[in-house]
């Protein structure tokens, strides 16, 4: 339905200015200007129509690269997330060394961030043995790649803040899954999920619970030495636990 709406907007934009004008008479500057006008008016389908015409008619214009970036944002604002991600990925493939790749990585991370449902809601609706929520994980990886490649990007601070939020949510998810395995007496599975959280999401406050899960699992397996070692790591990292650990 959203794709149909976007198509209607695009057709309306073409009709408003004349299809022949867009195809033949408008130069790159005017095409881009008209696209920006459509964008500012909230007509994202019309904006895409102008930007795509600019790309098709003037592929080597300096404005074409900016138009390609604007198409990503227009799709995003129109609610066409898959199209926005595809446009961002295409830009990265065609322009791997372009200085604005930081923007495409940021937009991909933002789109996945917006798509990620509340993890606690998912925990009560899906099998607890399911893998971590894909959209949250993808968003985390996109922001991670952005910070690795473009540490001085204007989007770096926002990406970092979102990563902290995602890191904590994903670590919490892993703990919920590990608790599930602990209740099922699948102690090796519980240890592996807790270890995964510790290795993948360093710095998350939820890792205190991850260590507690490992201690409990080791004890139930009769591995008292490993339980004691993990207890020392817990105390060194977080001090004495403030609450008694429970698997419920």
Where on the chain are the PLM-derived regions?
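Sec-dependent bacterial lipoprotein signal peptides
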Residues: 1-17
């Amino acid at each position: 339905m959203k794709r149909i709406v976007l198509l209607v907007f695009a057709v309306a934009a073409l009709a408003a200015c004349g299809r022949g004008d867009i195809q033949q008479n408008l130069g790159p500057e005017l095409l881009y200007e008209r696209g920006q006008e459509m964008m500012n008016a909230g007509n994202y389908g019309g904006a895409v129509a102008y930007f795509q015409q600019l790309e098709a008619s003037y592929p080597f214009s300096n404005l074409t690269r900016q138009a390609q970036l604007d198409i990503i944002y227009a799709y995003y604002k129109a609610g066409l997330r898959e199209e926005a991600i595809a446009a961002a990925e295409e830009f990265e493939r065609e322009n791997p060394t372009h200085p604005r790749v930081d923007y495409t990585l940021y937009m991909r991370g933002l789109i996945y961030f917006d798509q990620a449902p509340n993890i606690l809601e998912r925990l009560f609706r899906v099998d607890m043995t399911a893998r971590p929520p894909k959209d949250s994980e993808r968003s985390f990886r996109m922001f991670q790649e952005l910070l690795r490649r473009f540490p001085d990007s204007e989007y770096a601070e926002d990406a970092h803040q979102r990563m902290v939020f995602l890191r904590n949510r994903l670590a919490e998810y892993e703990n919920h899954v590990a608790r599930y395995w602990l209740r099922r007496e699948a102690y090796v599975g519980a240890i592996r999920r807790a270890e995964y959280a510790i290795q993948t999401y360093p710095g998350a406050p939820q890792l205190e619970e991850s260590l507690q899960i490992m201690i409990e699992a080791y004890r139930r397996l009769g591995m008292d030495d490993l339980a004691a070692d993990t207890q020392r790591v817990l105390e060194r990292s977080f001090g004495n636990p403030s609450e008694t650990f429970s698997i419920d």
